[in-house]
C-alpha cells in the first residue's frame, strides 16, 4: 500500500495574504468554514466596507476548522475554490517586433517597410528618425544593421524627429537586431501574482471580490476580464486539491498562447515542474510549482553605486541610471548595455526538487519518456484514493477507496490474452475487482427554498431515476423543482427543516468492465474483461496468480521501460488453464490506480421517456434518462451521403402543427384555411424572430422573411402568460413580449426591470448563440432510441455487429454507430445490435480504424433506426468495411515486452518504429529543442540522467504544445470562417 504524505505547508502565498490584510477586524467574521459549506455561504470578513474572502490557514482563519486539511483555499457559496497564481511578464524594453520608449510610446514592426507608433491610444505610421545612424552605434553587427536601415530609410518620405534618449536608441537597436535575426529575442521574465495580491487589487478598485469568484471574471493588474483566475476545487483526491492551490497560469487567452509562453525553460529548473501541465490546447499554459519551491513575500532592497561606466539599470521597472549593482538577492538580468533587476514579491525561489508533488511520486520517471510522465501526472489527480476527507459527509459527490490509499500493488503479466493483442484493453481478476471497491458519497443540499416533499427514508435503497424530493422557489421562472437520483445508492442521512435539506446517498461498487485504470507510467486502459480463471506462474514452488494482464503492444511506441523496471525485470513461465506457454513472460508487482472515469458515470440509454413540453424533444441529461443529441456534424455527414430517409426519421420526433392563411401566408393568424405539419423547432424560432421584428410567410409552398406586423397580437397587462404555447406572443406596454415558456430567467428579469434594449439582445442570444434555439433544435436534434457508453473490444463479434449495454433495449435491430467529433463520412456506420451483459458497448477491434478509436476510455453513440427505408439506405451508404489493424498482425499468445519481443513487434510492423527500439536500448541521439539540435547519449533502459531528462522534458512539452498550436480548424469553426469569407 502506498501512503500519501501531503504536508500542510504553504509556499509563501499565505504570508503575502497576511501582510495585505493584517488590520482586518476578525469580529466581522460571522460563520465557520463548516457552516459555510453546509448552508452555501461565503467564509468572509469585512474590509473597507466590502466582503473579504478568508484564505483557509491564514491569520484571519480563526475557526481552525479546515475541511480539506489543506491551506490556501477559499469557501464561496459553500464551494471550496482555489485561486491560481498568475504569471505576469516583467517589462523589457524590446522584443522581436516592438520597442518601448521612455515617453511610453510603442514602436511596432509589422514588416520592414510598415512600422507604427502607438501613443495615447493613437496608432500612426512611423519612419526612422533623422538620427537613425545613432541606433547603429550600439550594435555588435554594425554593417548588417546599417545596410538594412539604409534600405528602409530610402523608402522614407519623411523622417521622424531625432531620438536623443540613449535607452530608446539601445532599445530600437536591439529590436531591429532581433527582427533581422542578428540577436536572440530576450526570454520572458515574469513574477507571480498570488491570491492575496489579486484580492487586494480588486478591493482597492472598490469592486466585489465575491462577484469575481461567482462570475470568474477578474482584473489582473491592467488586464481586464481574465477568466482563468479562480476555479472550483474538484475534490477527486487530496493531491489534486493540493496542486490546484499551487497552480500557475497566464492571464491571456490560453488556447491561443504562442510557443514561447509554453516551453520548459532552463531558468525554471527547480522552480516550475517540467512535466505536470494540461494536455491539449492548454499545454504549457497551466503549470505547477516544484515540490519545495517558494515565492518571495517581500520587496527586496538593493545596494547600487553610481558609475559612468555602469549599465543602464532598472529596478522593478524604475530607472536608476548608470550604476554598478552590489546585491545578489534579487533576480538580475543583463542584456549588453541594459540591466534589469527584479526584486518584487512573487518571484519563485528554487527548491531541491525537479518536479511538483505529483511528479515526485514517479519513482521511475527517468526510464520513461517525459510525455508519459505528463499524462500520468494528470491521471494521479483523477485517481480514487482512500483519504477520509473524501469519504465523509462534507463534500458533494466524492469517491474514495474503502481499502488502500493511492492504488494497490498488483501481480502483473505483460502478455496477450489468448492470442488477442488488443492495446489498452486490460484483463483483471475478480479479486482485483473487489480489492478496488470504492464508496461514492452524494450530498444533496438545499438552502432558502421551501421543501415541499421528501419521498425517501433513511436506509432506503434508491434506484437511478427515483424521485428524491421537491422544492419551491418563487424567485425562479420554474418555481417547482423535482430532484431525481442520478445513481443507485442507499440513503445514509436526512436533515430536513422548512427551508433547508441535506440528503446523503452512499453507494459501494467494485471495479467493472468499462472502468479505467492506469499504472504510474502512463499505461492507461479500460477494464475489458474480469476473469475468474487467470494465468499463473510458480515462485519458489508456490503458485502465484496473475492479477492484471496488460498487452505487450502498449510498450514499443510508448517506451515505458520504467514499468518493466518496477516489475523487477523478471521473466517466468506462465500457465493458462494448466498449459505452459512456450516462452517466458515478464511478470512482477506494479502499482495500479483506479481512476474516476467509471462506466457507471458514462452509460446512458433511452427508448422513450419524458419529453420537454416546450421543444417536444426528449429531455437532456443522464439523471433524467434524457436523449442524446444528433448534432450538426452528424447531420452534415448524412446530407453528404444523401441519406434523406434517415434524416427524415431522425428529425421526425418533434412534429407539430401550424395554421396558415393561404392568401397571405401568415402563420397562426386570426384567419386560416389549412394546417401544416412541421417541427416544433420552427415554431420556437418563429416566436424569437417575431419578438425581434421579423416574420416568416409560407405561401405556395415557398417561404419568405418579412417585417413582422404585430397589430393583430392581443394586448396584456400582465407578464404571466404563455406557459405552454410557444406562439403565444402578446403586446405588453407597447413591446412584443415572448411567452413564459421561451423566456430565460435573465430575460424575465429584464422584462420586469423594463430594460427592453437589453432584452432584445438577450432574445437574439436565445435564438442565435451556440446554446440558442437554432443551433440546439434545428441544426441538431435530441432523439429517442439512443445509447452512449464506453467501448471495449470483443474479437468474437462479427465486424458489423456490436453488443449494447445490459438493459439498454431501445427496440431497434439496427443502429448508427458514431464517435464524436464526426470529422468524415466514416464517423457513422450501420451496425446490428446485440444484447450484452455489461454496461459497455462491445465492438470488434477491426472497427477502430474507421472511427479513429481505441480502448483507453473512448465513448461512442448508437442512434437506433427502425424504418425499413432508412435501414436499406444506410446498408448501401454506411456499410461497415473491415480494416486490418496492427493488433492482429501477431498471433502469439506468449509474446511479451522484453527486448526480443519489442524488436519482433517493430520488425513485423505490429507496433512502433525502429527509432523507438534505439531510444529504449541504444541511444536517444539527436533531438530538436526550439529549432536547435542536441545529442542525448543515454537510453531509457539504462535510465537517462537528470540533465538529459530535463532536456527531454523540453522536447516533450514542445511536441505536445505544437499539436494544439498547429491543429487545423474543423467543424463548427470552419463553417463560421467559410460564412465570413463568402
Curated annotation (Swiss-Prot):
Q: Which reaction does it catalyse?
A: RNA(n) + a ribonucleoside 5'-triphosphate = RNA(n+1) + diphosphate
Under SMART domains, the record lists:
RPOLA_N
One MF term in the entry's GO annotations = DNA binding
Q: Name one GO cellular component term.
A: DNA-directed RNA polymerase complex
Q: Which InterPro entries match?
A: DNA-dir_RNA_pol_su2 (IPR015712), DNA-dir_RNAP_su2_dom (IPR007120), DNA-dir_RNAP_su2_hyb_sf (IPR037033), RNA_pol_asu (IPR000722), RNA_pol_bsu_CS (IPR007121), RNA_pol_N (IPR006592), RNA_pol_Rpb2_3 (IPR007645)
Quote the protein name from its UniProt record.
Probable DNA-directed RNA polymerase
Function statement: The presence of the two linear plasmids, termed pGKL1 and pGKL2, in strains of Kluyveromyces lactis confers the killer phenotype to the host cell, by promoting the secretion of a toxin able to inhibit the growth of sensitive strains.
> Could you tell me which species this protein originates from?
Kluyveromyces lactis (strain ATCC 8585 / CBS 2359 / DSM 70799 / NBRC 1267 / NRRL Y-1140 / WM37) (Yeast)
Q: Which Gene3D superfamilies match?
A: 2.40.40.20, 3.90.1100.10, DNA-directed RNA polymerase, subunit 2, domain 6
> The organism sits in which domain of life?
Eukaryota
Which controlled-vocabulary keywords does the entry list? DNA-directed RNA polymerase, Nucleotidyltransferase, Plasmid, Transcription, Transferase
Which family does the record claim for this protein? Belongs to the RNA polymerase beta chain family.
EC numbers listed for it are 2.7.7.6
Biological-process GO terms, alphabetical:
DNA-templated transcription
The reply on keyword Cell membrane is: no
State whether keyword Transcription applies.
yes
Q: What's one Pfam family the UniProt record gives for this protein?
A: RNA_pol_Rpb1_2
Amino acid at each position: 500500500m502506498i501512503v500519501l504524505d501531503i504536508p500542510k505547508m504553504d509556499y509563501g502565498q499565505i504570508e503575502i495574504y497576511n501582510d495585505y490584510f493584517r488590520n482586518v477586524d476578525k469580529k466581522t467574521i460571522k460563520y465557520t468554514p463548516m457552516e459555510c459549506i453546509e448552508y452555501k455561504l461565503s467564509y468572509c470578513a469585512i474590509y473597507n466596507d466590502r466582503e473579504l474572502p478568508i484564505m483557509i490557514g491564514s491569520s484571519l482563519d480563526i475557526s481552525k476548522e479546515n475541511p480539506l486539511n489543506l491551506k490556501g483555499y477559499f469557501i464561496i457559496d459553500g464551494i471550496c475554490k482555489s485561486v491560481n497564481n498568475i504569471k505576469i511578464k516583467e517589462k523589457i524594453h524590446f522584443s522581436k517586433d516592438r520597442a518601448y520608449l521612455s515617453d511610453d510610446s510603442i514602436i511596432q514592426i509589422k514588416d520592414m517597410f510598415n512600422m507604427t507608433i502607438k501613443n495615447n491610444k493613437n496608432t500612426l505610421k512611423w519612419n526612422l528618425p533623422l538620427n537613425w545612424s545613432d541606433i547603429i552605434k550600439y550594435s555588435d553587427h554594425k554593417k548588417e544593421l546599417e545596410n538594412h536601415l539604409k534600405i528602409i530609410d530610402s523608402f522614407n518620405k519623411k523622417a521622424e524627429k531625432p531620438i536623443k534618449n540613449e535607452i530608446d536608441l539601445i532599445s530600437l537597436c536591439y529590436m531591429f537586431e532581433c527582427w533581422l535575426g542578428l540577436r536572440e529575442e530576450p526570454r520572458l521574465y515574469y513574477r507571480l501574482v498570488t491570491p492575496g495580491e489579486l484580492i487586494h487589487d480588486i478591493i482597492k478598485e472598490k469592486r466585489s471580490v465575491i462577484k469575481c469568484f461567482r462570475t470568474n471574471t477578474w482584473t489582473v493588474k491592467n488586464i481586464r476580464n481574465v477568466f482563468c483566475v479562480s476555479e472550483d476545487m474538484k475534490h477527486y483526491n487530496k493531491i489534486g486539491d493540493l496542486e490546484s492551490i499551487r497552480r500557475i497560469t497566464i492571464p491571456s487567452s490560453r488556447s491561443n498562447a504562442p510557443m514561447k509562453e509554453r516551453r520548459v525553460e532552463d531558468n525554471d529548473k527547480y522552480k516550475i515542474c517540467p512535466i505536470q501541465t494540461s494536455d491539449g490546447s492548454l499545454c504549457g499554459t497551466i503549470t505547477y510549482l516544484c515540490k519545495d519551491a517558494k515565492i518571495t513575500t517581500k520587496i527586496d532592497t538593493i545596494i547600487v553605486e553610481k558609475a559612468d561606466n555602469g549599465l543602464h539599470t532598472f529596478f522593478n521597472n524604475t530607472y536608476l541610471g548608470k550604476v554598478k549593482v552590489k546585491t545578489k538577492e534579487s533576480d538580475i538580468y543583463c542584456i549588453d548595455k541594459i540591466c534589469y533587476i527584479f526584486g518584487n514579491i512573487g518571484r519563485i525561489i528554487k527548491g531541491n526538487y525537479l518536479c511538483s508533488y505529483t511528479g515526485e511520486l514517479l519513482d521511475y520517471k527517468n526510464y520513461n519518456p517525459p510525455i508519459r510522465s505528463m499524462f500520468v501526472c494528470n491521471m494521479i489527480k483523477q485517481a480514487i484514493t482512500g483519504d477520509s476527507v473524501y469519504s465523509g459527509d462534507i463534500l458533494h459527490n466524492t469517491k474514495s477507496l474503502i481499502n488502500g490509499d493511492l492504488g494497490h500493488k498488483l501481480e502483473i503479466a505483460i502478455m496477450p490474452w489468448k492470442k488477442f493483442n488488443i492495446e489498452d484493453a486490460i484483463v483483471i481478476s475478480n479479486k482485483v475487482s473487489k480489492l478496488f471497491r470504492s464508496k461514492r458519497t452524494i450530498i444533496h443540499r438545499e438552502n432558502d427554498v421551501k421543501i415541499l416533499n421528501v419521498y425517501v427514508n433513511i436506509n432506503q435503497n434508491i434506484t437511478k431515476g427515483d424521485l428524491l424530493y421537491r422544492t419551491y422557489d418563487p424567485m425562479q421562472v420554474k418555481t417547482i423543482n423535482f430532484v431525481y437520483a442520478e445513481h443507485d445508492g442507499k440513503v445514509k442521512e436526512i436533515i430536513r427543516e422548512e427551508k433547508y435539506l441535506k440528503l446523503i446517498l452512499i453507494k459501494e461498487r467494485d471495479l467493472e468492465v468499462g472502468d479505467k485504470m492506469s499504472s504510474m507510467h502512463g499505461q492507461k486502459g479500460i477494464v475489458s474483461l474480469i476473469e475468474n480463471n487467470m494465468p499463473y506462474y510458480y515462485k519458489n514452488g508456490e503458485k502465484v496468480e496473475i492479477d492484471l494482464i496488460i498487452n505487450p503492444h502498449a510498450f514499443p511506441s510508448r517506451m515505458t521501460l520504467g514499468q518493466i523496471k518496477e516489475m523487477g525485470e523478471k521473466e517466468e513461465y506462465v500457465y493458462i488453464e494448466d498449459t505452459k506457454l512456450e516462452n517466458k513472460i515478464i511478470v512482477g508487482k506494479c502499482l495500479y490506480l483506479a481512476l474516476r472515469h467509471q462506466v457507471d458515470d458514462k452509460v446512458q440509454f433511452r427508448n422513450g421517456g419524458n419529453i420537454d413540453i416546450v421543444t417536444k424533444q426528449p429531455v437532456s441529461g443522464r439523471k433524467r434518462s434524457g436523449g442524446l443529441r444528433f448534432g450538426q456534424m452528424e447531420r452534415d455527414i448524412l446530407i453528404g451521403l444523401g441519406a434523406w430517409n434517415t434524416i427524415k426519421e431522425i428529425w421526425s420526433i418533434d412534429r407539430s402543427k401550424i395554421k396558415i392563411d393561404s392568401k397571405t401566408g401568415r402563420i397562426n393568424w386570426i384567419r386560416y384555411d389549412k394546417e401544416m405539419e412541421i417541427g416544433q423547432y420552427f415554431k420556437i424560432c418563429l416566436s424569437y424572430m417575431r419578438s425581434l421584428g421579423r416574420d416568416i410567410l409560407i405561401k405556395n409552398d415557398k417561404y419568405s422573411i418579412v417585417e413582422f406586423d404585430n397589430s393583430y397580437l392581443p394586448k396584456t397587462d400582465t407578464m404571466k402568460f404563455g406557459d405552454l404555447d410557444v406562439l403565444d406572443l402578446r403586446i405588453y406596454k407597447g413591446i412584443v413580449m415572448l411567452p413564459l415558456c421561451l423566456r430565460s430567467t435573465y430575460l424575465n428579469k429584464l422584462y420586469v426591470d423594463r430594460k427592453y434594449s437589453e432584452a432584445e439582445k438577450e432574445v437574439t442570444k436565445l435564438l442565435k448563440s451556440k446554446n440558442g434555439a437554432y443551433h440546439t433544435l434545428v441544426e441538431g436534434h435530441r432523439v429517442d432510441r439512443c445509447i452512449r457508453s464506453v467501448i471495449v473490444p470483443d474479437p468474437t463479434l462479427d465486424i458489423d455487429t456490436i453488443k449494447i449495454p445490459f438493459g439498454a433495449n431501445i427496440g431497434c435491430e439496427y443502429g448508427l454507430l458514431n464517435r464524436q467529433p464526426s470529422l468524415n463520412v466514416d464517423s457513422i456506420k450501420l451496425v446490428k445490435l446485440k444484447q450484452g451483459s455489461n454496461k459497455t458497448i462491445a465492438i470488434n477491434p477491426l472497427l477502430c480504424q474507421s472511427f479513429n478509436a481505441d480502448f483507453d476510455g473512448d465513448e461512442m453513440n448508437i442512434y437506433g433506426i427502425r424504418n425499413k427505408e432508412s435501414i436499406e439506405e444506410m446498408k448501401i451508404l454506411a456499410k461497415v468495411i473491415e480494416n486490418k489493424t496492427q493488433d492482429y498482425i501477431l498471433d502469439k499468445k506468449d509474446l511479451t515486452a522484453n527486448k526480443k519481443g519489442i524488436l519482433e513487434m517493430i520488425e513485423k510492423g505490429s507496433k512502433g518504429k525502429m527509432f523507438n527500439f534505439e531510444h529504449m536500448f541504444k541511444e536517444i541521439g539527436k533531438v530538436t529543442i526550439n529549432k536547435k539540435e542536441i545529442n542525448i547519449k543515454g537510453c531509457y533502459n539504462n535510465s537517462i540522467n537528470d540533465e538529459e531528462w530535463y532536456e527531454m522534458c523540453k522536447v516533450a512539452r514542445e511536441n505536445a504544445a505544437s499539436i494544439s498550436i498547429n491543429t487545423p480548424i474543423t467543424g463548427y469553426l470552419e463553417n463560421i470562417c467559410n460564412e465570413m469569407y463568402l
